[in-house]
Each structure stands twice: as structure tokens, then as C-alpha cells.
């Protein structure tokens, strides 16, 4: 909106659904992030998908923006809101996102983008960010909601690097997951960046107290083997 309260545009882009997570990372009030997320979630529930463009005045998907190409932004914001609030509502959100993917987008070779959110016609495409980001955020949302011993963290830190685990369960140290979101940043493309405790930015520290940021965790080596049947 403009300073006088008037709308700059009546159209809402699905790409902007990352905004609630950015507000939280910047240390903004959680209520503002929740309110913004609620608007996107209402649009999603109307169609069972988030169209690329939605018009607030007509309350319809814009005719050239009716597609929903499996974007990650809504799942990203749900993850950050859950981490901040521990509100089970965001787990329900994650469940509905997964159900929609399975009900509407699952095909023999993977998952297809929705070409039209009204007819649920599918497109012949599955962008790489679906695996790199969308599924990653959904995995973390539910993995971090579990008790530490039940988590399946797929990265584990030692003193010098981040290595893949052989174990399907992952490992935890002192009740903390190996992939600590208090010491790890996820880029807009879902890439992991390990943050040294002495270089945590002010914005990051506003979200997570500096004394909560630990150094890299050491995990015991895994010797799990898989039997073939």
C-alpha cells in the first residue's frame, strides 16, 4: 500500500508468499507475519493451489496467471512460522500442501505443475526448485516437529564440513538436530549455509538470540547397513 493507504496493485503474486518468512528472519512482529500468511493461505484453500496471480478486487485468479508451478514460498513461510510459534496450525498447513500435491499433481514420473487452478489441468513440467526447495521445506517442517530421537536429519556437521549421513535416522546432540536452524541459513534457492557463531548478522540474531547459536555439532559416525531383500 501507499503511505495514504491506497493499494499500489490489487494483484497478489504467489512469489511474494515468502514475505512472512522474511519478516520473521528480520525480527519483525510475529503477528504481522501471521496476518500476511493468512491471506495467502485463504487463496490456497480456495483453489487447492496457489495461482501465480490473484486479483483481490474480483477475487479470482488472473486469466494469464492461473497456473501453480509447484512453488516453495508458501511451504517456506509455514516452516518459519512453525519454528517461531510452535503452533500446530502450520503442521496442518503442511499436511494440506502435501495432500494437494498427491491428489492433484502426482503423475507416473513425478509431480506436474498445475496449468489451471480452476480446472486442475496439468502442465508437462516439474521445475527443479520443486525438489531443491518445496520438498525440502516440507521435510524440515515435519522433521523438526518430532522428538529429537525420531528426526531424520539428512545432514550432519563435524568440525570442518557438512556430510551426508548413512543412517536413515540421522543423529542428534544434546537434544538438538544436526542441522541446526539457529546456525544455518537457507538461501532463496533452498541452499544451506552454515553460519559461524561469530558472524551471525544482526537480522539473524533478532530472530534467534545470539547465545542460542552454537558451534558446529559433532555426531558419532554411523555404521548402519542396508540389507537387500
Describe the residue ranges of each PLM region:
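Glycan-recognition and catalytic cores of secretory/periplasmic carbohydrate-active enzymes
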Residues: 1-229
